[in-house]
Regions:
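Conserved redox-active cysteine motifs that mediate thiol-disulfide chemistry
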Residues: 60-77
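Hydrophobic beta-strand anchors of alpha/beta hydrolase catalytic cores
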Residues: 57-58, 89
Length: 163
């Protein structure tokens, strides 16, 4: 009996990454979502618990992406203007190296948080094709906006309606 329980436990543990990836891969507009673990470029993990009740903007970008280079300064200004109202911006770099992402963040002087893509995050990104890709999660954890394109300033300012 103990051996059977042990085997079932080991099987469940071995399937956990697959289950976690499957959950993130199914993000659809209107769903309540939970972002996967993310380690920021500074080595700190994102603690999602204190962010409950905030509006979260998640963005995928790459340092080579000209659309991201135009969108990110606008997104950063928007973040600075609305952070006190409960806005959090967390971005995920698709760069091959953390060094390239760190240089991009430093050069842009961005204040939003950034991490590197992982297999769990990659499943979310691969739902759509193109950069930048932006998701907005409302205060209740519901996915309320998905954009796969360069957002102009008016588009980004419109995110304030979720605050």
């Amino acid at each position: 009996m103990n051996r059977r329980n042990l085997m079932l436990s080991l099987l469940a543990l071995s399937l956990w990454p697959t289950i976690a990836i499957a959950q993130t891969a199914s993000w659809k507009l209107g769903d309540t979502v939970r972002p996967p673990a993310l380690t920021l470029l500074n080595g700190q993990p994102v603690n999602w618990e204190p962010l409950k009740g905030k509006v979260i903007v998640l963005e995928f970008w790459g340092s080579w992406c000209p659309f991201c280079a135009r969108q990110n300064p606008i997104l950063d200004r928007f973040y600075k203007q609305h952070q006190a109202r409960g806005l959090e911006v967390i971005t995920v770099s698709l760069d091959k190296t953390a060094d390239a992402a760190q240089q991009y963040m430093k050069k842009g002087g961005y204040s939003f948080k950034a991490g590197m893509v992982t297999p769990e995050w990659d499943t979310i990104y691969k739902q759509r094709r193109g950069l930048p890709q932006l998701f907005v999660i409302d205060r209740k954890g519901k996915l309320v906006l998905i954009e796969v394109r360069e957002m102009l300033e008016d588009d980004i300012l419109d995110i304030a309606r979720f605050l």
